[in-house]
């Protein structure tokens, strides 16, 4: 089973109390949600939200205090205006919000093209309505693709990789992860990053972020925190790369300046060596938390 990252730290900063209404905006496999429910008492409510249509069919929690929405967490302010949201929840704002921005080991193994470790259809989409990565490669110009790889992957060979991909597309459209890896590998120099990471790592990250509008989703939910959380409500966000962490840090800082929130984490919280040994995925996790004023 997918191990929830920074579980103790999430509970510490989210601080769910009996009777509260908490939102897990990235339900995933439900690891954080199960622990949150333990703290809510008989009258608390937990709303799970996930864009991945498979999450709730596989990991739905059988508990009258739990309800779920198959939706994008960026739409939470709209979801909460719907009287059905949260089922028995009588308020349209929550006392806590958790966002774990990583993708799970189950998604990596889902056959949807998130991983470059095996050859599978190049989809990279969390649901069936999002345009798949293979179509994105066809639609973007070389210049546009280079911008995606540079800005979302922070890849220094962005131009060479974009050119190699578009050159390959002229011969035969790239349909699988294996074909994309081959194009990338041809573009980067031998000894790429001195072997520290796979040559495809940053390009795959960039395409996944672009296909699913991950940074735009994060910015949208941050803009609407006051519509989502009650005064005193807590938001806990776990990010896994510098682009996400920078957005969270800057929004928290800007909201603090105008007296909208109190930052609870002066520096991002990271995993202990013990947790990293058990769950290597936690190595790059950074947790930031704040309280709405």
Language model segments and positions:
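S-adenosyl-L-methionine-dependent methyltransferase catalytic core, i.e., the SAM/SAH-binding region
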Residues: 1-293
């Amino acid at each position: 089973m997918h191990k929830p990252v920074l579980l103790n730290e999430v509970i510490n900063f989210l601080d769910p109390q009996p009777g509260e209404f908490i939102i897990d905006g990235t339900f995933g496999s439900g690891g954080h949600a199960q622990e949150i429910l333990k703290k809510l008492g008989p009258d608390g409510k937990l709303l799970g939200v996930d864009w991945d249509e498979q999450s709730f069919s596989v990991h739905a929690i059988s508990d009258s205090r739990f309800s779920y929405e198959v939706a994008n967490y960026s739409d939470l302010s709209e979801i909460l205006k719907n009287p059905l949201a949260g089922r028995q929840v009588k308020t349209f704002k929550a006392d806590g919000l958790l966002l774990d921005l990583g993708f799970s080991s189950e998604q990596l193994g889902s056959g949807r093209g998130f991983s470059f470790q095996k050859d599978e259809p190049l989809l990279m989409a969390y649901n069936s309505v999002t345009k798949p990565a293979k179509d994105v490669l066809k639609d973007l110009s070389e210049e546009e693709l280079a911008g995606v790889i540079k800005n979302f992957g922070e890849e220094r060979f962005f131009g060479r990789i974009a050119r190699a991909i578009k050159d390959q597309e002229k011969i035969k459209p790239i349909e699988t992860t294996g074909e994309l890896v081959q194009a990338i590998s041809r573009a980067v120099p031998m000894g790429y990053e001195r072997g520290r990471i796979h040559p495809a790592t940053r390009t795959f990250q960039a395409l996944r972020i672009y296909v699913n509008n991950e940074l735009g989703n994060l910015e949208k939910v941050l803009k609407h925190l006051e519509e989502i959380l009650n005064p005193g409500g807590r938001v806990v966000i776990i990010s896994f790369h510098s682009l996400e962490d920078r957005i969270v840090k800057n929004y928290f800082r800007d909201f603090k300046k105008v007296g909208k929130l109190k930052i609870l984490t002066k520096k991002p919280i990271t995993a202990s060596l013990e947790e990293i040994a058990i769950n290597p995925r936690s190595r790059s996790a950074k947790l930031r938390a704040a309280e709405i004023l």
